[in-house]
C-alpha cells in the first residue's frame, strides 16, 4: 500500500518533461475511512465524485508546437485510491516536451493512466484554446453561515459542536461557508476552501455548524478525507434524512480539488470555478 509519507510531497523533485505514467502516486482511501468509523469490506453511507481541475496542461503537437488546455478529471468516490496531488502535477508536467497526435489522443492517455492508478473509471474533459473564452465562474449557492458573529476557540475537528433540534419539523436547507481551512496531511501547508451543505432533516444549529467547520483550521488531512469526515460527523450528530457536502478548494500547483459526497440521488454539482479559485 502506498503511504502518504512516501509520496513526493515535501521532497525535492526532478521535473520530468517527457511522459512518465509512473509518476502518479495512488493512496488508498480505506485507512482514513477506517478512522471515521467506516470499516473495510462494508458499504459506505455516501457516494460522489472528486472533481479535479488542471490549469497547467501542455504538450507538443507532432510538429513540435506547444499546445495548452484546461483539464477536468472526475474520479468516483468508490475508487479504492486517490491520487496524491504533487504526483499528479509532476505527471501532467511530464507531457510538456512530449509529442501527442491530438487532444483526443491525450484525453485517452489521461483516462487510461488515471483509471489504472485510482482503480476505477476516471472521466477526462479537455478545454482547448478555442473554447477558453466560454468558461464560466460562479459561487456556491446557499445561506451564508459566515454572516454570524460568533466566538471561536476550537481549531481541531469538534463534532460535539454540531446540534440539530429533533423536536422541530424537518426543513430543506442549503448552507455555505468560505471559512473552511485544513492543512496538507504530509507538509502541513494550508488548504483553503468553500463548503456547501445541503440537507433535509431536523434544523441544524447554524452557529454550531459554522464553529465546527472552522474547527478544521489546524487539522491535517487531504481534501477528500476532510469532506468525508464532515459528512460522517453531520450524519451522526444531526441525523439528516438527506445530506450532500460539496467543497471547492483553492488551487495549488496548478490543480484544484473539489470533493462531493451525498447519500441521495442528485446530479453532480456544477463545476464552476469560484472567485477564490
From Swiss-Prot:
Q: Keywords, A to Z?
A: Cytoplasm, NADP, Oxidoreductase, Queuosine biosynthesis
Q: In which pathway does it act?
A: tRNA modification; tRNA-queuosine biosynthesis
**What reaction does this catalyse?**
7-aminomethyl-7-carbaguanine + 2 NADP(+) = 7-cyano-7-deazaguanine + 2 NADPH + 3 H(+)
EC number(s) stated in the UniProt entry for this protein: 1.7.1.13
Amino-acid positions noted as binding substrate in the UniProt annotation, renumbered to this chain: 83-85, 223-224
A GO CC term assigned to this protein in UniProt: cytoplasm
Location in the cell = Cytoplasm
Active site (record annotation): 184, 191
Binding residues annotated for NADPH, in chain numbering: 85-86, 252-253
Give this protein's Gene Ontology molecular function annotations.
preQ1 synthase activity
Q: Name one GO biological process term.
A: queuosine biosynthetic process
Q: What is its main location?
A: cytoplasm
Keyword Transcription regulation, does the record have it? no
Domain of life the protein comes from: Bacteria
So what does this one do?
Catalyzes the NADPH-dependent reduction of 7-cyano-7-deazaguanine (preQ0) to 7-aminomethyl-7-deazaguanine (preQ1).
Q: Which PANTHER family match?
A: NADPH-DEPENDENT 7-CYANO-7-DEAZAGUANINE REDUCTASE
Similarity comment: family membership: Belongs to the GTP cyclohydrolase I family. QueF type 2 subfamily.
Summary of subunit composition and partner proteins: Homodimer.
> Any idea what this protein is called?
NADPH-dependent 7-cyano-7-deazaguanine reductase
Task: Give the source species.
Answer: Cupriavidus pinatubonensis (strain JMP 134 / LMG 1197)
Q: What is the lineage of its organism?
A: Bacteria, Pseudomonadati, Pseudomonadota, Betaproteobacteria, Burkholderiales
